Amino acid sequence: MGLYARDAATGEYIKCNVSKGVILSTGDYSQNTRMLKHFCPEVIENNIQCLFTNVDVEGNFTNQGDGIQLGMWAGAQVQQSHAPMIHHMGGGADLAGVGVMGNAGFLNLDLNGKRFMNEDLPGQQLENQIELQKNRESWQIFDSNWPEQLPYMPAAHGGACYYEDYASEDEGPKNNTTYRNYKSPYQLEAAVADGRAVKADTLEELVAKIYPDDTAAQQTALDSIQRYNELAKAGYDEDFHKPASRMWAVENGPFYADKFTTALLLVCIGGLESDEDCHTFDADRNVIPGLYVAGNIQGNRFATEYPIGLKGVSHSMAMYYGYVAGKNALKDI
């Protein structure tokens, strides 16, 4: 038992023999198109791009699922259900994937001008809804009262939940706890200036900008906004049951919109079948002696997604089970 490694500089191979076992800790396969097509076809079908583009010294993507394939060749079984982590972080996203207003639960309309969901959703469920829409796109819409509304939004991954009152990059945020969860007038106006957001003095002007040459969608959007305003003022969303605490009438200009598209793939949660001792298993569910896993290659950690409300859950599990794998390999457990 052991491994072969190749020296990229010389091309020479190195053979390493081990006596206590092998620990596979090689990450996921989010840059391997063939594996994505097999295990997570929706990533390919929806043209989801991978957030991480790390490469090795030869320019090859590092997250190719090599360790999973090595384990399979040794007889290890792969977790059957996989969960691609595609956490939507809002429309008009910057290079870090963070949107103009994050995934805050403001009104959202499809390309026909219709409201189609309860907007108060976590990032993964929000992504699922966007993928069901025409062209996998929609419009987030809000008015000038957004600074007063942000504190009522959840502190979600990629969300916006507090307001910073600064109007220039030089001035900067006053409470720089995290760059992801605050929004400022400077950020919003910068997004308008570079085209990531749309601004208008009236709702009629706004819908004309976001639905150009489609008068039917413009009228449907105005009707949808009027309906949403009525529900917000009534304090009950009988259409999609969004909490009243996060519904506000969209009626005070200027008005803003930013386009939601598909989000970025963070990681594919689905590796080799494993347990709390980091073992791997063959087709008959027998432990494969001496073969352990830790990190994203370790399957059976999450069923559908990891809970983003539990901060650091993925990294902490990778660190902890790396320790467990090392300890068990040393003791031949």
Question: What positions do the PLM features span?
Answer:
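Conserved redox-cofactor binding core of oxidoreductases
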Residues: 1-12, 19, 33-34, 231-252
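Active-site and channel-lining beta-strand-loop segments
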Residues: 2, 104-120, 270-282
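Glycine-rich loop(s) and the adjacent beta-strand/alpha-helix scaffold that form part
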Residues: 6-91, 315-318, 324
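Short, glycine-/Ser/Thr-/acidic-enriched flexible segments
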Residues: 8-10, 21, 28-30, 114-115, ...
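C-terminal structured subdomain/cap of oxidoreductase catalytic cores
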Residues: 17, 156, 170-172, 270-333
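An anion/pyrophosphate-binding glycine-rich loop and adjacent beta-alpha core
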Residues: 68, 74-209
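Short, small/polar residue-rich loop motifs at catalytic or cofactor-binding pockets
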Residues: 101-103, 266-268, 311
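A glycine-rich dinucleotide-binding beta-alpha-beta segment and adjacent secondary-structure elements
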Residues: 202, 213-305
